[in-house]
């Protein structure tokens, strides 16, 4: 089977999860367990797509010092590795989990220092894989040293080849990507309310304001805007229709990776030729629901997604 989707992660991380009874500042602790997982938003998207049965390639930048953690995930899930290797170690994010209170403290360590030459290395890996219609997910933050328009550069490259770019980032990189010419705009974006407010420069306090902001993006050339609204679900907007998709019940536990799973669901909808907005919303929301129920930011099951899709609550925008 030929390649069906690409994800690009410029700032991946190894998630090191340390289990403790209780975290006490200034004290010496004995951990009950520790595990290392390959992480980063695009990596999570690739893993979910692979679980769905898609042939997916992961691109990005990995430090050779600890690339083995990522290589193990790629082998396990059947993900094609097209990551650009550089000297040094990929960053590690510490997650201190307190069993007694079920709380997690995150400590994100500095990442690799990269430059334009490294971004060009990723672009060189990407170029021969691109083709018309191919879903290309550009996801996550930028490491130190890369210019704010790094996603915009890769977005323009993929769009010029006719690929369908799904962009999930925030802050200045999002602003730069959304300033592109109409022909270089992403196919879809998935901001949350706060990220969209940062782009518009003013509060978006209700569904009408969110929908108006989404249509402003569509007027610039984007085909689909998906706005995460937390416990309210997600707002899906196209030029001629909009709807809200909600899970039937609130999930328990960590929401880490739920947004990445939703992006994977959007890519899966493109691959399944889900032409109706409701089909797309059901599948994307079901991916997110299944991720929450699995307890693993990188894991879904096709059976779980199909069951969840039927249970997604679809409503009109008030």
UniProtKB/Swiss-Prot annotation:
Q: Which InterPro entries match?
A: 1-PFruKinase, Carboh/pur_kinase_PfkB_CS, PfkB_dom, Ribokinase-like, Tagatose/fructose_Pkinase
Pfam families, alphabetically?
PfkB
Query: GO terms for molecular function, please?
Result: 1-phosphofructokinase activity; ATP binding
CDD domains in the record: FruK_PfkB_like
* GO CC list: cytosol
Q: What is its EC number?
A: 2.7.1.56
Positions annotated to bind ATP? 228-233, 259-260
Catalysed reactions, semicolon-separated: beta-D-fructose 1-phosphate + ATP = beta-D-fructose 1,6-bisphosphate + ADP + H(+)
Q: Which PROSITE patterns match?
A: PFKB_KINASES_1, PFKB_KINASES_2
* Induction context: Induced by fructose.
Question: Kind of enzyme, top EC level?
Answer: transferase
- Entry keywords, A to Z: ATP-binding, Kinase, Nucleotide-binding, Transferase
Q: Which residues form the active site?
A: 260 (proton acceptor)
Family named by the database record: Belongs to the carbohydrate kinase PfkB family.
What NCBIfam families does the entry give?
A: 1-PFK, pfkB
Relate the protein's function as given in its record.
Catalyzes the ATP-dependent phosphorylation of fructose-l-phosphate to fructose-l,6-bisphosphate.
The protein depicted here goes by the name 1-phosphofructokinase
In its UniProt entry, the species of origin is given as Xanthomonas campestris pv. campestris (strain ATCC 33913 / DSM 3586 / NCPPB 528 / LMG 568 / P 25)
